[in-house]
Amino acid sequence: AAIGGSTLILITTLLLAVVYRKRSSSSKLHLMNSTSSKVEKFLEDYTHQMPTRYSYPELKKITNNFADKLGEGGFGVVYKGKLARGNLVAVKILDQSRHSESQFMNEVATLGTIHHFHLVRLLGYSFEGFRSALLYEYMANGSLEKFIFVEGDVLGWEQLYSIALGAARGIAYLHDECNRRIIHFDIKPHNILLDADFTPKVADFGLAKLWGKGSDHISITATRGTPGYVAPELWSRNLGPVTDKSDVYSFGMLLLEMAGRRRNIDVRASRSSQLYFPEWAFKLIEKGELETRLKERGSTEMGSEDEEKVRRMTKVGLWCIQYNSNDRPSMSRVVQMLEGNGDDVTNPPMPFNSTPSPGSTIAIFYRRLFVDGLTGS
């Protein structure tokens, strides 16, 4: 009887497991079908503006059966490919997750409808059920990140300055010049790509949002971006509305990393005062010692014109990361400041608030900035 009872329990458990798996599979299939219908409706609405659509078998042919992997990120894997007419492309195969749907539509809705010399071009896309992919122009030199965080000054100051100015022009176009304003929300060295001639192009619009020209702010439900580049108002709504000035903050952090040729938060810094580069750079500017100290760190000669470029990049970067978003310049103004035309950039005020109390909103922001930036969490 005991054996019979055990057998009955086992059979019942197995039957329940089978039923659960069937229901789970059915639920997943329903979700996939729902997602597929949503994306297809979106593509139908944008069809008159869309780049070329490719089938999955065509993607396999373009990438030689996904033979040449270029890299892997949070949203998928990127492969090198070649179109029939000979153009080299980067093919991003998106992960099958709830985030890939929104990233796919974000990229198509933004890059699929705009064109600018300093924005990476979306050349095509693929969507078949749960499989989606995006095809971009191929950027031979990869991301800016691998050139500014390495030992030895691979890029000269003039080249770095040109890259900074080009990236600024691309972002300014998003904010002020295209038909529908776009906030990128993830400006950082990894998302500035360089072609064979080191022309910079802003990439990765997976977190981007369209922003109506009549609106004075944008609504978001969660913090967007990468720790270390995220503006204070994105951490806490008490610090002001989210606007295009959030991108300005991120660009400022990027610009400072280019000027310092190091990460803004560097746990390997020889002195604690140099741990956070923006604060150290601000103090050096106040003392008039910026160029001298950066010369000591660099491996290439720095002439007077180079010194001017570094000084300008640093000052503009510090203006961009002002704690109060109203004190930050627009990206169009940033372009003007970088172009210079002989005019010096005025010294920025202290970008950071005075040392906050441990429980204040400001303290929470700085704790997140440092802890998340250092740990990558």
Question: Can you say where each PLM-predicted feature lies in the sequence?
Answer:
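Intrinsically disordered, low-complexity cytosolic regulatory tails
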Residues: G4-T7, S26-K41, V89, S272, ...
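Conserved catalytic-loop aspartate of Hanks-type protein kinases
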Residues: D247
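Protein kinase catalytic-loop region centered on the HRD/HxD motif
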Residues: R169-I182
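Membrane-proximal cytoplasmic juxtamembrane segment of single-pass receptors
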Residues: A1-L135, A140-A167, G214-T221, T226-P227, ...
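Pre-DFG segment of protein kinase catalytic domains
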Residues: K201-D204
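Activation segment
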Residues: L207-K209
